[in-house]
Amino acid sequence: MGDGGVNAVGEGVNQSHMLFDRFVQATTCKGTLKAFQELCDFLELKPNEYRVFYHKLKSKLNYWKAKALWAKLDKRASHKEYKKGRACANTKCLIIGAGPCGLRTAIELGFLGAKVVLLEKRDAFSRNNVLHLWPFTIQDLRGLGAKKFYGKFCAGAIDHISIRQLQLMLLKVALLLGIEIHVNVEFKGLIEPPEDQENERIGWRAEVHPRTHPVNELEFDVIIGADGRRNTLSGFRRKEFRGKLAIAITANFINRNTTAEAKVEEISGVAFIFNQKFFQDLREATGIDLENIVYYKDDTHYFVMTAKKQSLLEKGVILHDYADTEMLLSRANVDQKALLSYAREAADFSTNHQLPKLDFAINHYGQPDVAMFDFTCMYASENAALVRQRNGHKLLVALVGDSLLEPFWPMGTGIARGFLAAMDSAWMVRSWAHGSSPLEVLAERESIYRLLPQTTPENVSKNFSQYSVDPTTRYPNISLHQVRPNQVRHLLDTGETRDLRVDLENVVNSSTPKLTRNESIVRSSKLLNWCQRQTEGYRGVSVSDLTTSWKSGLALCALIHRYRPDLIDFESLDEKDVEKNNQLAFDVAEREFGISPIMTGKEMSVVVEPDKLSMVMYLSQFYEMFKDTVPPGENQNLSPEEKAALIASTKSPISFLSKLGQSIAISRKRNPKDKKEKELDGLGKRRKTSQAGQSEDEELQRANRDDRPSIATALAERKIDSAAAANNNNKVKSMATQLLAKFEENAPTQSTGLKRQGSFRKEFPQNIGGSDVCFFCRKRVYVMERLSAEGKFFHRSCFKCDYCGTTLRLSSYAFDVEDGKFYCKPHYCYRLSGVAQRKRPAPAAAPANAKEPQVLAVSPNTVDAPGQAITTQTPAERRPSETEVNGVTEPSVAKRLKGTPERIELENYRLSMMREEELEEVPEETLAEHNLSSVLDKATDIEEGSSSSESDMEEEDEDAEAAGPSDLGGVPWKEAVELHAKLKGESDPGADDDGLHDGDGEMDEDEEEEEDEEDEDEEEEEESSEEPCEEDDDPEAEAGSPDFEPGTEIDQEDIPSDAEAEARSRCIDEVVTLPVDNDKTESQGQVFNTAEKTSANPRELIVDVVLSPIQKPALPIEEVHEVSPVVLVKSPGARFFPEPYLPDKVKQNIPPPQSPDVKTPHSPVAQIIALSPICSQPVPQPGTASPKSPVQPQPCACSPTGNPLSPICTQSQPCNEPPSPLSTSSPVRTQPVPAVTSTPLAKPASENRTNEHLKDSTPELKKTDLIEEFWLKSAEIRKSLGLTPLERSKTAVEKSIVKTPTPESSSPKSYTPEDLSEEQKPTFTGRSIIRRINITLEGQVISPVEPKSNGSEKKDLSSSSGLGLNGSVTTSQTAASDSYNNSDSTMLTPPSSPPPPPPREEPACLQNKKSQVSWDNLLEGTEEPKSETMPIKPRTPVSPPQPKQKPVTAPVPTPRTNPPVVMRVKEPNKPRREEVRKSFVECVDEIPFADDVEDTYDDRTPDASGLEKFYTPPTSKVNRDKPPLHLALAMENGKPNIPGVSRTAKGSQHFSPEAKEIAEERMRAREKSVKSQALKDAMAKQLTKMKDSEVAKGAVAKVAWDIPETKGKSKKQSKAQKDSAVKALESKKQADTLPDRFFSTPSSKALDSSVTSSESSTGGKSKKRSSLFSPRKNKKEKKAKNERLSSTEETPPKHKSLWKAVFSGYKKDKKKKDDKSCPSTPSSSTTGDSGKKKDSPLDRSSDLRLRRNLSFSEDSDLSCDDVLERSSQKSKGDSVYVPHALAFKRSYATKKTYTEEELNAKLTRRVQKAARRQAKQEELKRLHRAQMIQRQLEQVEEKQRQLEERGVAVEKALRGEADYWGESNYSEILDLHLGGMGKKDDPKLMQEWFKLVQEKNALVRYESELMIFARELELEDRQSRLQQELRERMAIDDHLKTEEELAEEKQILNEMLEVVEQRDSLVALLEEQRLREKEEDKDLEAVMLSKGFNLNWA
């Protein structure tokens, strides 16, 4: 074919490369096909030459990007099974459907060398629904080059992808392999080979539409159905797995990829299954009642929820309650608007109102992408393949995907099993091509298919890299010959009579499962004989029948006594006391064996003869239980061992569960599991319930006992739950509750209704007593459907919670003896609340009850309306359950045969839409344009869509976008597209300005892969903010370009404020004030412009903007936005003008924000708190106004105050100030700071700035306000996050404020305490400002005027911030004593923003090291630094108080105070300033912490714990000793490492062995982060206790600091440690310039390292660590800078570096680009560092040396991971390729920057990520297991309902109740036995009855086992959550805790121990049962399988 056009090498080659890129990047189906066609045309290739196409393409396309893809595909194609593409060389395959499974099958067949033709009826991929991916699926797709096509593919912890993206990816691979793909072609049917084969041998062909299509002429050997339909290919019988009514709603919202959105936690597969409280809150708040909800962030925000019918009716989504599901969910019966608002409300609530704008994406009809469908029934094909043979031609027919096996979508089973089936089918085609006989091929395929429904992520082979088409590589214990060829004869269709049967059965499923198991008691004679043998020899017992012989009760007692003589004293029984004897037997059987009674003793004594059917049911359970047990013989003197064995063998899991439940219930708010369990059993065996008499009383008492405690527990738990819920950590009990609630819920209400319908008790036979009347509805209860609990008998569907109307399960309910009512466990505590409390629930309950009658009433309609067409369906298909309510066949059956629920829904949608209006399909491009506009706008270049390079810019972008696209929600799509184009235009420029955006995005993507899920969410946002920082970070960038001026950098560093902004946004979202939105929009516009103007500061601008909108009303936001941009611009300018004036302005700007914030807090603070912490802070509108004036005054003060420094400040702020909005902008900034989750840290930063400003002017009040606001906001945020520490934080804040005044006074020195306190408030607000100032300062290192004190202040503030982040670190930062104080403050800060604490802690440690360095300098300079009030020099002496404050501060948000301490004028030297800068960096670190908070959040539920930890450790330890300061600092640095260890130890102490590992890891991480010595000590002890491994770690830590294991004593602990720390400090002191840095580096780094490692352990921490690292470096840099005050510019870069380091480190964690950023961050710190290093190589060497030490110690503490991470980070940082100038600067800075700190941070991050990922995986596994159990329970329930229906039919026939006829779907059963009418003992009917009883018993047992598994899972989940909470609590020193807290800790520990105990006993019980019933289980499994009860299909 020649090279044709390619000969013009240059152009041709480039053209081909461009075409290839276009193909790879195509985002639509049509676009992909078009690009591929162009590429082939250009290269002169013909895809239909499938055998050589791929090889020719490869040879002609010599392009490096393509080669990477070829390498992937070649590796896959090299599998030996493919035989180099010749395995199926002559096979022609037709695949119907281009869904993921069809494409995947095509790819496998392509590799095998077959000719593959794929038909797709549409030409657009429009399904945004998101699929959860199992690990092997991810690996499989990566192996096909997924990341080459879709860079964001499963980056970091992401494990999901939209169907659309997956289809595009696979489509491209298929095209490259030469697979023919035809779109707009619909398969109509198969054309058999003609009979006349002599003239022309024509094989099987397909009939397709359009008829002229060439595919009509092709012949095929294999046809595979992959279109998701059930009847495209005939001959496949279906099994139906019916759960209770399940209505799913899916919704896709536009994802604008803003930082705010990125921060919102995903809700994984079944995360909320365990969080019952969340669903209750949702219901009470909105009236929406869900079973579960899943949220994935992808191209869209994808939500899928299972809604309860009742709530859909109440909310008006469903208009009329029809029994038939299809009618129920038909378009005519659904109010579309109500559905949209329902979905939006649920999505909004479940994400804590943090998604800024929920605008629906559009589907391919241009309608909002919301769908509601019924997945009550899941279908599976009974066989996977068949062979059709006609006229000498064989055709292999197979199914894959949903057609084969419908998935349980929340668990990702669809795509995972779909891919497995695709490979299995390819393997079958391979065998077919190899000439195996059709029966052998089919037998092997069916053997493999039997495994498919059971596959889970856990039981597939773990060696994913070895997966191939060969099934043995994928299924661990597979037998390819399980099914024998003669068993699949029916699958070989030769065209004879069999077809008819196959097709018929396709429609009608046999309704009665066949029993394969030995029909043990099918004959009553067998049961009778067994009973006679067992009761032989007992006095007064003569069993001759199954009725009268049992009336006295002696026979029952004898039966029990035979096996358990210890339970009944048979000799004492009186034959005449019939009632007592029977009641005793019933009670004992229920209590000990879990066999529910079928009546009461009283009833038994009254009836003439017991009911035979009931007795058969009851006695058969004894038979099932004891038939394989050998009775204990005549000798009753059993040895204890024998007795134990006997008891074990006769112990029922249910009875055990019930007992266990009791204790557990008490500890948890769960209910007495006792009853539950029994009931559970009872559930299975409806009739078995507790007897009325004693057993009932006992049970009641027990219930009361359980329940009361359970109430108390419930209350206690409620607290935990809220925290947990906030953190998405659901408690086990929640899990159990929810599980149970779900299990119970909506149970088959319909069915009952139906049953009851006909069963109104006309006249009960004489022998029927109270047990035949339903306790709830007073109607007749038949034996088979009887359930009993607490001595009451009822229908399953009548068993509802009295409060909420949820259907209960016997295994999980609560009973109130006093009012005789039943409750679900979650609502038991409401039972006394009465109607008053009912509010929402009541309606639900009523409806629940009303439901039945309603259903009944409706049923006729249903029958009439839907019935006609559908009635034709066979009974089997209708299923009683389906039809139950009406008794009419379900109309939906016909349709159901065709497609999956979603598909049917879509079809319905289309039909109805076409009727309503002419609907044109929207082109895929338009869809993408609308739905993915934000992605396209912002991140076209960056696949990730999170451009780290322009975090500010991006935020701006996003906000603007939010303003624009967000409005698209209601806009018609065409307008939307236009709008989008405009918006795109707007945002793009900004993005362009931020050159980094692109590169960063890429990097982010890579790094994301490494990042944790937690990081991920935040990562995107952080990335944005971080990237700019990174730019700034690079010293080169900073120094080199005005844009990146230090000041600017710092401003951008405000980006940390990005995180804040995000947090704020979140808060704002929560607050959700329209003004904010409007403002956002307006300000966004401004911001955009600004951003465009200053690409360097885009991030900052954006952050401010975002924050501002979030924080406050439109005006403030607008102002803020404006200011921000100005500031950014100025920043660069600031560098230019470092004159005092500029500094003043800068300061002014900063203070104004503070001041506005402050002011705002005064008035708005309360509001803010109410609204949301974040919102509040930004909200202060009044503040904004006020701040303006204060700002101006401040500038005046500032100008004089900070000459060099002020210039720095000015740098960024002078420009800002110029515009009137400047002040506004500063408030905005301030707001951003508070917004930061790690608000506390940010606040300190603000404080520093504020202090400076305050000194300059009187913005102190504002500061105070700001601080207050900040605290309030942070508290609010915390609250919203579910962090308990909020309140504490608040308290801390107040106290902190008190102390802060000192720092503040430092800044205004003359301020009074009140002023100070006010200042403090502003400090909070000021934090963001401080950040700016610090940045500027660092950048210029000039603010000597306010300078030293200001610089110090700044340092302190930042330190304080840092402390907030990591108390210890911050402490370290300030002067020796100061640093102690700082620690205190820091600790306080953490309380203020609990989520960030853990990360903070680490950063704190890191910072501490830096601080130490700083401190040394400070100490040298002045010992004053100790004074808590950094701002006031006099206060400097206050340092001693600082130590005090430390403790005090710890509780209070002293962070501000600490910052003041840091501010000590002592540091007045430039070094001091440098320190300030560091502190600022730390502040920045803190800011990132906001994001971190999220991480932390994820990491550990209790934010409060983290905060508390911070409080204590840092404060008390470091602050105390001034001289020891160095030592203390060093120790603290070491300590963080050690704390990790000790913490670990502590954790292990409390945890069970299982939890030990995780606990240890977490402990370690925490330790590192822990600031306080006490805490550390405790942790150290804990760790040592915890494990030997921990000891090793501790040793390492010791090595690092030469500290003994006792961390708590870290100061004393090891003199070596102290020495090292001291030395480091001294070093710092020695060389304020270089040494300072050097020391700072060593101690700082060591600390950093330890912090890092701890951070890596904890997700959140890792991010912070990164920040911390940079801050340390920054501090060093700062010192160096201070030393060389003259090099202001360098200082600013350093400052920037610090800030960036903080931010970029944070982001880095998140993304690879971020990784670069990280290096940048390090470079940031190093940048400052770098600059310093440049200035003084000495610094660098010392840094390195220090680093070495540090890394060692860190390693010890952090463990090798840190070192590894460090090195990897280093290499990563060095090697990171960023294509932009900024990137270059960044990389340059990175190289320099990549100090051990940075590396450590990175390593830590990585370690943390790994740990977080591990924890998340464990949680996901639990969730998946819970989901499966839930699904199985639902199926069991459905099966039971069907059994009950049949049982009722049989019972009625046996009793001769003729009204039976009209009601049952089982008339066929009775038709068989018409002759038996009225004959009680009709043998056939009795036989049927026995069968049913046996099946029911099997189900009951199965169900009880499931409940035990659920219970075990619940306990496991509970334990892990308790461990987490405990770990967090223990991170705080005991002396910092109140008595109550200590008591709570003890309580948690006790509860955990109890849980562990219960788990052990459960596990033991299960194990015993396993062994004992191994054989029996095989039987049971066989029975279940034979009945189609395979419960693993879900």
Curated annotation (Swiss-Prot):
Residues 1796-1855, 1894-1960 form a coiled coil. Residues 1661-1679 have a biased composition (Basic residues). It comes from the Eukaryota. Residues 1200-1215, 1369-1389 have a biased composition (Polar residues). Residues 1299-1314, 1358-1368, 1649-1660, 1718-1729 have a biased composition (Low complexity). GO terms for biological process: actin filament depolymerization; cytoskeleton organization; exocytosis. It comes from Danio rerio (Zebrafish). Residues 2-498 are annotated as: Monooxygenase domain. This is Protein-methionine sulfoxide oxidase mical3a. InterPro entries: bMERB_dom, CH_dom, CH_dom_sf, F-actin_Monoox_Mical, FAD-bd, FAD/NAD-bd_sf, Znf_LIM. Monooxygenase that promotes depolymerization of F-actin by mediating oxidation of specific methionine residues on actin. Acts by modifying actin subunits through the addition of oxygen to form methionine-sulfoxide, leading to promote actin filament severing and prevent repolymerization. Involved in exocytic vesicles tethering and fusion: the monooxygenase activity is required for this process. It is found in: Cytoplasm; Cytoplasm, Cytoskeleton; Nucleus. Its EC number is 1.14.13.225. Residues 674-684, 975-987, 1249-1263, 1287-1297, 1464-1476, 1616-1635, 1680-1693, 1730-1746 have a biased composition (Basic and acidic residues). Residues 1437-1458 have a biased composition (Pro residues). Its main location: cytoplasm.
